[in-house]
Amino acid sequence: MLEFFRPPRARSPRELVQLLPEAWTTSRSSTGSANPSASRKPARYPRIHAPELQSGEARWPLWSRIRPLEDPLKQRLTNLEKKITNVTTKFEQIEKCCKRNDEVLFRLENHAETLRAAMISLAKKIDVQTGRRPYE
C-alpha cells in the first residue's frame, strides 16, 4: 500500500525529451515535411555548456533582476540595522508604558495616603461623638 503513495522517480532531461511527441522535437521546412537531420532537442532550450554561460553571465535576463545585487556583508549589515531599529522602538514603547505605570502607581499611592488620613480623621470624630478615647 505504501508503494501507491511513492512519488515517481525523477527523470533526466534527455528522458523527458524522448517522451515528447515526435511533432514537437522535429523541425519542419517551409513545405511542411519533417527534417530528420534536426536535433531532437528543441532550439528554445539554452545549451548548458555554452561559452557565454561559462563566462559568468546570467543564464536568464530575469535572474539579474531577482538576484540580490548587494554582497552578503552589506545584506548582513542592513539586517542588523533593521533589528537594532526594531529593538530600540520596542524599548521606547516599553519605556513609555513603564512611565505611564509609574505615574498611575504614584497617583494610587497618593490616593491611598489621603484615604488613610480621611479614615483616621473620621475615626477620631466618631470617638469624640461617642465619648470613647481608645487612642490614649
Swiss-Prot record:
Gene3D superfamilies: 1.20.5.110. GO terms for biological process: fusion of virus membrane with host plasma membrane; symbiont entry into host cell; virion attachment to host cell. GO terms for cellular component: membrane; viral envelope; virion membrane. It is found in: Virion membrane. InterPro entries: Chordopox_Fusion/A27. Residues 24-38 have a biased composition (Polar residues). It comes from the Viruses. Its main location: virion. The keyword Glycoprotein applies. Keywords: Glycoprotein, Host-virus interaction, Membrane, Viral attachment to host cell, Virion, Virus entry into host cell. Glycans are attached at residue 86. Residues 22-50 are annotated as: Disordered. This protein appears to play an important role in virus penetration at the level of cell fusion. The N-terminal proximal region is essential for fusion ability. Essential in fusing the outermost of the two Golgi-derived membranes enveloping the virus with the plasma membrane, and in its subsequent release extracellularly. Homotrimer, covalently linked. Belongs to the poxviruses fusion protein family. This is 14 kDa fusion protein.
